[in-house]
Amino acid sequence: MDTYTKRERTIYLLGMLGQNLIYGVIGTGLTYYFQSVIFLPALAISTITLLSKIAEFLCDPYVGMRIDRSQNTKGKCRTYLIFSPLPIFIFSLLCFLNRPYTAAETSTARLGILLAAGLSFIGFGICFCFGDVALWTLPNLMTKIRKDRNALLAQARIVAGICGAGISLLLLPLSQAAGNHFSKQRNDPTFGLQMGTVLVCGSFLFLGTLLFQPVGFCTQERMTAPPAEKRSLWQNLAEMWRMQSYRRILLSGLLRTPSGLMNLLQMTVLSYYFGNNGRTPYVHYMLLLGIPAFLGQLIAAGAAPKLADKHGAATTFA
């Protein structure tokens, strides 16, 4: 058979859903947790995020190089998809198991909290990079038919968009509702909000891992290629920099940085300004903000493959 089965397609899309659940929890929930639950300093959050992005920037080409060189009998991508979900879950959960910064009484304790937050977040980013690169590369190996490959990637983008929008809308209100419940039981708002956030985010992380894990076991790679020639990481980076398309992608990522920062800030603004940190309903404001953005992503994800087939990928994405 030259292409994937319906079962493989379903498992792959469920895995994409699970992976984006995990990513959404970290992207939305962890920022809120750092800022509004354990009260890390803004400078510390910025530094941790910067270091994590640098680690991911170096990790991406390294993982691609490892996948190209792979000669494993399970396939180039499946090995990473089998072994990456559990470390991703462990590091993502560790990100939420930290003491409030304001509860530390000594500088050593405060430094320990910052180190724990930074190491767990950077560890998550590195582990997630292995799973992410393998997951998005897998459709190229699951089928020999270009039309089927493009269709699967388009469906994956739609699933990722739906999941991202859903987790953004649900995560903070659910965490704050659970936090208010625990706060009333313990008469301690800080402890209650921390417990509520850990419970809700941990549940989503566990569900995402359950959906993500089967992809490596239940899919098949049909495209085979000889291992790529061995080159160092720096040789690969130099080769990529000589490619005009790579420089365009890098520039595009830099230009999108402000919008990414806005996405991180908007949930905090909505939660505090409109929702009084969970004490006032504010979901309708989130819907007003999120629905247009979600529809735009959905339309773009569905239209991009068709435009690429008609006009060429270089023209469409230039």
Predicted regions and their residues:
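Membrane-embedded alpha-helical bundles of multi-pass transporters/translocases
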Residues: 1-318
